[in-house]
């Protein structure tokens, strides 16, 4: 596929102001019921083609097995800017999540929740937009200092615990509440979804695997687990018809 530059008007300062306004909608409160399903969201990008791949994987908390998987592929015009990840990734993650056959009890996003310079990372943004409890799971710390406390190591800023660290370097993740959940609940769910011997929660791990695999297919290779391929359904954005054949050849169902 030939490279196509996709440009759009984007103001980082306006986006940051929007985050400050939207964070007023964030509520950190206990879950109303015990969750049974968790949705993992992640996105990957083919820089050569300017295409983003958003993956939404719904898993059972009881078995940690995927029960549904949707992918949305589209051209992306917003650049990567630290702290403003949601404005780039929601363009492909939100349509993937909307295509799922059932709503998740909790959404887990590869990125931060309130452990963010404006207390409104991508997990908080997703939670507010989808109106679902959300958790951020990130591989790097954005703000705060590490302080040891009861139950583990915490990310603390201005006396507030924003996230808890699971694992040890270099195999560690920073778990923070995004919306409609407490830090303790977010940590408990994240721990419960890490398989023995692993270090990443299964919902975001699978979403990461799938989004990167499809990015590889877009780049001209075929590398995807056949079991995942049989589960995932893919929707293409405008003017991406040329991707349908290689995706079908890789065993994916294209809608």
Curated annotation (Swiss-Prot):
The keyword Magnesium applies. Keywords: Cytoplasm, DNA damage, DNA repair, Endonuclease, Hydrolase, Magnesium, Metal-binding, Nuclease. Mg(2+) binds at residues 42, 110. Pfam families: Endonuclease_5. It is found in: Cytoplasm. One of its GO terms (cellular component) is cytoplasm. Its cofactor is Mg(2+). CDD domains: Endonuclease_V. Its EC number is 3.1.21.7. InterPro entries: Endonuclease-V. It catalyses: Endonucleolytic cleavage at apurinic or apyrimidinic sites to products with a 5'-phosphate. The record marks 80 as: Interaction with target DNA. Signal peptide: none annotated. One of its GO terms (molecular function) is deoxyribonuclease V activity. One of its GO terms (biological process) is DNA repair. Its main location: cytoplasm. DNA repair enzyme involved in the repair of deaminated bases. Selectively cleaves double-stranded DNA at the second phosphodiester bond 3' to a deoxyinosine leaving behind the intact lesion on the nicked DNA. Belongs to the endonuclease V family. HAMAP family: Endonuclease_5 (MF_00801). This is Endonuclease V. It comes from Aeropyrum pernix (strain ATCC 700893 / DSM 11879 / JCM 9820 / NBRC 100138 / K1). The lineage of its organism: Archaea, Thermoproteota, Thermoprotei, Desulfurococcales, Desulfurococcaceae. The gene is nfi.
């Amino acid at each position: 596929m030939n490279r196509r530059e996709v440009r759009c008007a984007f103001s980082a300062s306006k986006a940051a102001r929007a985050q400050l306004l939207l964070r007023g909608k964030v509520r950190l409160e206990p879950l109303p019921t015990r969750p049974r399903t968790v949705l993992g969201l992640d996105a990957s990008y083919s820089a050569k083609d300017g295409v983003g791949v958003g993956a939404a994987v719904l898993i059972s908390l009881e078995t940690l097995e995927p029960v549904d998987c949707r992918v949305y592929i589209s051209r992306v015009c917003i650049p990567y800017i630290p702290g403003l990840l949601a404005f780039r990734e929601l363009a492909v993650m939100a349509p993937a999540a909307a295509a799922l056959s059932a709503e998740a009890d909790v959404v887990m996003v590869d990125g931060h929740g309130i452990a963010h310079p404006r207390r409104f990372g991508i997990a908080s943004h997703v939670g507010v937009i989808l109106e679902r409890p959300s958790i951020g799971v990130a591989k790097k710390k954005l703000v705060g200092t590490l302080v040891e406390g009861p139950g583990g190591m915490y990310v603390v800023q201005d006396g507030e615990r924003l996230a808890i660290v699971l694992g040890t370097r270099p195999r560690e993740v920073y778990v923070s509440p995004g919306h409609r959940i407490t830090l303790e609940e977010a940590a408990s769910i994240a721990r419960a979804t890490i398989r023995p011997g692993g270090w990443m929660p299964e919902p975001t791990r699978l979403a990461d695997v799938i989004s990167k695999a499809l990015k590889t297919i877009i780049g001209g290779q075929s590398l995807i687990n056949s079991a995942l391929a049989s589960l995932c359904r893919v929707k293409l954005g405008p003017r991406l018809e040329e991707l349908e054949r290689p995706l079908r050849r890789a065993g994916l169902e294209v809608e």
